[in-house]
């Protein structure tokens, strides 16, 4: 899928790979970095008789870097994947846009850091919300549709070479039927792979039971699960 594309680009161009996995409520500290307060307090306690000890705690040795700062300061050319940016709020998106546009990050009490390599940035979105126009204007848009049945079978087999052909084929076809339903979250290719792996582990002798018992690896909400069981699994299998 989209994540794999970013990894392949990094590998093909011999670049280091960094990833920011966005989610609802993600903060600047989780993207850029944060002060190690415990280490700062320990240093203050150990050096409480020194007059300038407070200034010393605002150095890089007391700062925990997160993916964005690591990608910026990496000496080797890199690829940064900002995965599912639509899950982050607009404030975080604006910050990322500014940092990447200006090629620098400013951290209070620590200073400004310049981009140190030729960084390729890849954003992925599942359209949970519309991205800012400024973000769209600065990106090359690429839509990646779900693969065909035949292609998805090939992908699953490449990930799970030990899986039975019949199991792979059945589950991939079921997933394609599921994607035609109006669901809150349709199963991803990763979900298909996980479902095949789970059914194979549970055993294919009672395929229908294994399929239903492991449905949660591909279907991620209770309402979607009920819909899939009612309209596809119980009706057709």
Predicted regions and their residues:
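C-terminal regulatory/interaction module of P-loop NTP-utilizing enzymes
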Residues: 1-237
